[in-house]
Structure formats: C-alpha cells, structure tokens
C-alpha cells in the first residue's frame, strides 16, 4: 500500500466520484493543515499532462490576509466560498514549463523507466515543438494540463474527507499579478475551494450523454 493511499479517508472510487457535488458554503471552523494540503496537491499532481510537462503551478490561499488579497481579483458572488473555505488552491498554467523539459525526462531516464534511445527520441521530437510554439499554443496546452489536475484535486479532496468546488469567476487580468506571479509566464485557470460543507449541496442533473456524443464514421 503506497503512502498516498494511507492518507485517504475514503478509498471508494465510486463514492468519491459519483457523490461529489459542488459546495459553495463551508464550515468556517474547519481548518486543514498545510501539511495535508501539500499532500493533497502532491496526490493531485500525479495527473497526466502533455508530454509529462506538468504545466501547472499552485497558490494556496488559507489565511484571512491572503483571502482579502485574493478577493481583489474574485467576482463578488464567489466571496462566500472564499471566506468560508478552509483553503483555496488556485491553479495557474505555466507556459514556460518546457524550460525544464530536459530535466524532467533525464530524471525518467535516470530512474530506468526509458532507454537512452527513447530519451533522445523524446527530446528530439517534442522539445522543438514547445521551443517553437506560439504563445497561444503554450497557453492552451497549459490550460488543458491544469484542467486535468484540477479535476483530480477535486476527487483527492473528497478522498481526504473534504468537500470542494472549482470556480473561475475571477478577474482574469488581475489574478496573476494579485497572486504575485509573472503574467508573462503564468495564465489563470481556476480556483478550488476546499473545506467541510456547512449545508447540503445542491444535487444537479446531467444531460443525457448520448445527446453530447458522436461516433466518427
């Protein structure tokens, strides 16, 4: 049993996934320690990413002072969850993640997970793609990575016995500077509020997946 599994309160995938609901009002008396928040982030970061670039960056907002600053770039209808959540984990996309691309894949090689031939193939194929990519490509690519890790963090929070809600009701121009990050490097993606629900969450329905699915002929 891995150390990550030992951290989980709920290891029932069906319950974690299908009984997950968005919570917007949390018990303000519940505090999640930073060690546990860091564990949850590490567990979420096992999510897949394009070319294993892991183009995400997490900013944890968990003090009254940090929340006051954070709210300067948040739409007012999201204030209740920001104020009541134990923590908000904001996920920003890193458009310069490829700068350490060689380091990432050299580590994979050094760990014995790929051959030298495969390493050379990866670096020769994918690194030039990112080095010559347009800014829009890098933003879209990082946003996809962040969306995947964000969904995983929602599930990890549930597995730790907490509730969560993903939100993007923010000022996209102000958020990155508000977080103290470089706007030339990072793009805002989403915030995830984590805590214990103070009330029964709204149970929503889903469209019939058949109406949203096509099979290419």
Curated annotation (Swiss-Prot):
Task: List ligand-binding residues for FMN.
Answer: 20, 22, 24, 78, 81, 165, 168-169, 206
InterPro entries for this protein? Nitroreductase (IPR029479), Nitroreductase-like (IPR000415)
The record's catalysed reaction(s) read: 10-oxo-(11E)-octadecenoate + NADH + H(+) = 10-oxooctadecanoate + NAD(+)
Q: Which residues cross the membrane?
A: none
Keywords recorded for this protein, A-Z: Detoxification, Flavoprotein, FMN, NAD, Nucleotide-binding, Oxidoreductase
Where in the chain are disulfide-linked cysteines found?
A: none
For this protein, the Enzyme Commission number is 1.3.1.-
Q: Which cofactor does it need?
A: FMN
- Which is one Pfam family of this protein? Nitroreductase
GO annotation, biological process: fatty acid metabolic process; response to toxic substance
Indicate the impact reported for residue 101 to F. 5% of wild-type catalytic activity
Chain sites annotated for binding 10-oxooctadecanoate? 51, 118
* Pathway per the UniProt entry: Lipid metabolism; fatty acid metabolism
Consequence recorded when altering residue 126 to A: 15% of wild-type catalytic activity
Taxonomically, the superkingdom here is Bacteria
Q: Name one GO molecular function term.
A: nucleotide binding
Q: What class of enzyme is it?
A: oxidoreductase
- Its quaternary structure? Homodimer.
Give the UniProt family note: Belongs to the nitroreductase family.
Q: What does this protein do?
A: Is involved in a saturation metabolic pathway of polyunsaturated fatty acids, that detoxifies unsaturated fatty acids and generates hydroxy fatty acids, oxo fatty acids, conjugated fatty acids such as conjugated linoleic acids (CLAs), and partially saturated trans-fatty acids as intermediates. CLA-ER catalyzes the saturation of the carbon-carbon double bond in 10-oxo-(11E)-octadecenoate to produce 10-oxooctadecanoate, during linoleate metabolism.
Q: Output this protein's name.
A: CLA biosynthesis enone reductase
From which organism does this entry originate? Lactiplantibacillus plantarum (Lactobacillus plantarum)
Tell me what gene encodes this. cla-er
